[in-house]
């Protein structure tokens, strides 16, 4: 309940700032599986500034749908700031009505983590 309330407050503040700047937002999500877009959409008035979202849970969708270079994933790792930024830029390029993008990539678990990137690791980008 506390997490839900905090997310609602953050989303409302985010929306107020977006409206003040006449901004429009698109999301690109991996480990959150649409949770960010869902939280934003639950905010009254979100239709004025939320353009939509991309859920790219699998690596292949990051490449195919958002244009994240395979070489970047190979060199930086799929859970990296560089890949999160590439996801955000890809979503923005494919959503011409958006002025900003929010992206996240990570390891949700319960398996799939490594010593370098344990379960619970996430990386975000806003462009």
Protein language model regions, located:
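Short alpha-helical segments enriched in small residues
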Residues: 1-127
């Amino acid at each position: 309940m506390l997490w839900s309330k905090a997310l609602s407050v953050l989303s409302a503040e985010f929306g107020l700032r977006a409206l003040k700047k006449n901004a429009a937002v698109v999301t690109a999500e991996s480990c959150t599986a649409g949770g960010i877009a869902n939280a934003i959409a639950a905010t009254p008035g979100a239709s004025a500034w939320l353009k939509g979202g991309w859920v790219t849970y699998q690596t292949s969708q990051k490449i195919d749908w958002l244009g994240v270079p395979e070489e970047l994933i190979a060199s930086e790792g799929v859970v990296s700031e560089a890949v999160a930024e590439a996801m955000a830029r890809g979503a923005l390029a494919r959503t011409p009505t958006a002025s900003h993008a929010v992206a996240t990539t990570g390891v949700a678990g319960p398996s799939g983590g490594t010593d370098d990137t344990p379960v619970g690791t996430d990386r975000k980008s806003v462009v």
